[in-house]
């Protein structure tokens, strides 16, 4: 049985940091494998340094400006996902990640639906996200939920020199 647990930095901070390191290691390994890049060298940072440099805004997300969920399956943290409001009506889906052993079980779709539902409760009528071009399973989930490709948006956390390897998507509820 799965459970979505709202992130509490007093309880989950270390696990959330570990999940983000695992997520970033996966992102950069796939980026390098799919495009023959040495992306970390181009950024001049290690994965833990990148996570430490980018984690603080996530640790401060609180409803109704945003929320982070951890997906717990049989007592184990199986995945994560976040929503951050970019404006009164626009939310961004961020850091959707399932650990490899939990992929293919529908948890990504369930997490996305949870984040969209909460985003609507927070007043969002439009949602944005970015996803790697090689992440076909994730793209399928997003397209099935009504997301369509759009141009880059300035709030994306993807470094400008890596954006050509990502898709940017948006879903409008109107």
What are these regions (language model features)?
Residues 102, 106:
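Glycine-rich phosphate-binding loop
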């Amino acid at each position: 049985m799965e459970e979505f647990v709202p992130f509490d930095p007093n309880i989950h901070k270390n696990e959330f940091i570990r999940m983000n390191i695992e997520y970033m290691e996966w992102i950069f390994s796939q980026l390098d494998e799919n495009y023959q890049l040495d992306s970390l060298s181009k950024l001049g940072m290690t994965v833990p340094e990148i996570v430490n440099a980018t984690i603080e805004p996530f640790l401060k997300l609180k409803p109704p400006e945003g929320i982070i969920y951890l997906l717990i399956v049989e007592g184990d943290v199986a995945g994560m996902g976040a929503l951050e409001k970019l404006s009164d009506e626009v939310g961004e889906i961020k850091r959707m990640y399932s650990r490899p052993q939990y992929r293919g079980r529908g948890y990504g779709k369930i997490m996305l639906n949870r984040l969209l539902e909460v985003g609507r409760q927070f007043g969002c009528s439009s949602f944005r996200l970015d996803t790697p071009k090689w992440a076909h399973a994730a793209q399928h989930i997003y397209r099935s939920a009504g997301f369509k490709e759009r141009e880059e948006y300035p709030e994306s956390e993807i470094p400008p020199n890596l954006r050509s390897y990502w898709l940017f998507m948006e879903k409008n509820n109107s």
